[in-house]
Amino acid sequence: MNNLVAIVGRPNVGKSTLFNRLTKTRQAIVNEEAGTTRDRQYGKSEWLGREFSVVDTGGWVVNSDDIFEEEIRKQVLLAVEEADVILFVVDVMNGVTDLDMQVATILRRANSPVIMVANKTDNNELQYNAPEFYKLGLGDPYCISAITGSGTGDLMDLIVSKFNKETSEILDDDIPRFAVVGRPNAGKSSIVNAFIGEDRNIVTEIAGTTRDSIYTRYNKFGFDFYLVDTAGIRKKNKVNEDLEYYSVVRSIRSIENADVCILMLDATRGVESQDLNILSLIQKNQKGLVVVINKWDLIEDKTAKMMKEFEATIRSRFAPFVDFPIIFASALTKQRILKVLEEARNVYENRTTKIPTARLNEEMLPLIEAYPPPSNKGKYIKIKYITQLPNTQVPSFVYFANLPQYVKEPYKRFLENKMREKWNLTGTPINIYIRQK
């Protein structure tokens, strides 16, 4: 189970730069015009063989240059509640501010370890400013420069040393893990209640630390499954969940620990930015997807035409991944709830699809010969052999070609679409790799 590292701090201390440094990305919030928040605050990192997730909670705050103290407080409370390790970023060039003091007051009550990161220590002289931060009462300030990378390797060592030991979970690998995710008020709690009913349906619960996901095993409607449950569904939130960054961070653990994500959309509101943010997390983690249009009972025009238009809109907003089941349901009336579980199980089975090598080549090579990759500067690309990789999280295929470097993304999407036409891969991402033959 991945550990979660949260970066907190007041504006302009270098949180985004540190996030990019830790996740080895250039998806900077820095120097970027405001737009969609997808993919900007969440990333994966690995150090000393330990994989963990990094979240910059401040990335969801609008107009962070003029942030209100209340928003900072909510951001820090979120980190205290959710994170395994908290990075409190301060600025050695500006010294201790009133806002730093307020953040530190909250963090001193945190159960998770807090590492105070003294950023912008771009030269040795600036290190002499760091002792000022002892007054915050959070131990030693750790000097780094997020821009140059100075000190970040040692910081990663320290982060990993703070992680709890891996919890051993006794889970049956043959039983699917479903997570219900979605923005606030989309009906997550209602559909969970519709799934599980009374507590007597619980078979067993397995939990690690208080911040770990709880895997609750159920047998409903003849289905055996684990429901991945985090604090976000049943626990009363300490922070107002209307905050966009809050609902997205809440979804991280559920998504990471699930096989299939049931994404709830509100039929009365359509697709909103938070839905796309959560979808992005699902795709980044390569999880199966079932989309549920909840509150369909509140829509007056329930004609087949309206359903088709609604479905087309969703697929266009979720593109390029469009091969997933969409179910129009009502958690309140339990309309099509059984269908949701059926589709989730089907997607789980599709994730484990194994296609024999002989069939892959029989079906795909004639198609490739008829529609070959576009030539590049007079060089013709030939794909000669296809095989499926073993032991992968999702179906993954290798196409062996003479000039793999010239096979572009549009042609890979063409191959993926043709594979989805020939085999049932609905709801699951697939990977296509082009390699030298």
UniProtKB/Swiss-Prot annotation:
Q: How does it assemble?
A: Associates with the 50S ribosomal subunit.
Keyword annotations for this protein?
A: GTP-binding, Nucleotide-binding, Repeat, Ribosome biogenesis
KH-like domain location: 353-437
Q: What is this protein called?
A: GTPase Der
Q: Where is the EngA-type G domain?
A: 3-167, 176-352
Any single GO molecular-function term of the entry would be: ribosome binding
Q: Which Gene3D superfamilies match?
A: 3.30.300.20, P-loop containing nucleotide triphosphate hydrolases
- Record-annotated residues binding GTP 1? 9-16, 56-60, 119-122
Biological role = GTPase that plays an essential role in the late steps of ribosome biogenesis.
Pfam families per record: KH_dom-like (PF14714), MMR_HSR1 (PF01926)
Record-listed GTP 2 binding positions:
182-189, 229-233, 294-297
Gene Ontology process terms (BP): ribosome biogenesis
Q: Which family does it belong to?
A: Belongs to the TRAFAC class TrmE-Era-EngA-EngB-Septin-like GTPase superfamily. EngA (Der) GTPase family.
Under InterPro entries, the record lists: G_ENGA, GTP-bd, GTPase_Der, KH_dom-like, KH_dom-like_a/b, P-loop_NTPase, Small_GTP-bd
